[in-house]
């Protein structure tokens, strides 16, 4: 599986083409839209999410509700484009019109792609950078992840995500799967403990009042993965490495870990390695899951646990110092409409990015043209864990 996204933040639409999805997989736009809706929620989101009502249109690769095995094209319309038509139009404009263009950006924002992107592509109006580097692109990636999740669900592989920290406020509780599934989306900061949730809201409110932003940590879990997906024989075939690359490619993500993550550096090996056990019903399993479901870059049958670190959003209503690229004079950075905290939404994005990487690895590991063929191969791999 692979995909390509296109579109600007305030352009007409986002488009994504997904290749490699097996044939005969049932897909409905409404199922994708449920995932899109989750991305738009979360405490701390800005006014943009009050304008956009993300709904996908599937324009190729699906017929009568089932995939054909050909590339799937999905379109997400940007409703806000109606307010930006003159600024983000496709047609050429005169030099005079360009000089008088509203919303031109020459004061780059610290922590964003503005300045370096302008240097790389020789853009004097940094809006040309901002529009594509915006996290609006993650709407397309959630659509890809939603298709991936539909595929994984057919293979009895399940995805979940949650927030574990916002601005230093942590929810480190351990919850059983059923409690997690029933409660996580009832909360606008995507944590289980309501007392902790309120502390997080208070932290977000304080940052917003101060014109600031805050980041946090999210966690993604993948349940019921077959064993030995990924490979140790080459660096680029290790599944945890691929997931790590996918996670840090999300806007504002600065770190990734698995299982206990960086805490593993504080403990002796005897407390970190997961002991191997065997049961006649389920086969090989581990007595713990400190390593987050991976050994040697391969799945070991335990739940995959991925932790992603998101920095505070760089657009601030109390802007930091910057320099105008034309005059070279000191200025406060440009203010662009933004969120004060996008960590809850980022947990949804991270879940869908991981879903794609897992689905991609599955379809590479088990070469299948249609979903029934893929299911049979997955069942065979699961038997291997018992019979080996």
Curated annotation (Swiss-Prot):
PROSITE patterns: CHORISMATE_SYNTHASE_1, CHORISMATE_SYNTHASE_2, CHORISMATE_SYNTHASE_3. Pfam families: Chorismate_synt. InterPro entries: Chorismate_synth, Chorismate_synth_AroC_sf, Chorismate_synthase_CS. Its EC number is 4.2.3.5. GO terms for biological process: amino acid biosynthetic process; aromatic amino acid family biosynthetic process; chorismate biosynthetic process. NADP(+) binds at residues 39, 45. Transmembrane segments: none annotated. Its cofactor is FMNH2. The keyword Flavoprotein applies. GO terms for cellular component: cytosol. FMN binds at residues 132-134, 251-252, 296, 311-315, 337. This reaction introduces a second double bond into the aromatic ring system. HAMAP family: Chorismate_synth. Belongs to the chorismate synthase family. Homotetramer. PANTHER family: CHORISMATE SYNTHASE. This is Chorismate synthase. It comes from Staphylococcus haemolyticus (strain JCSC1435). The gene is aroC.
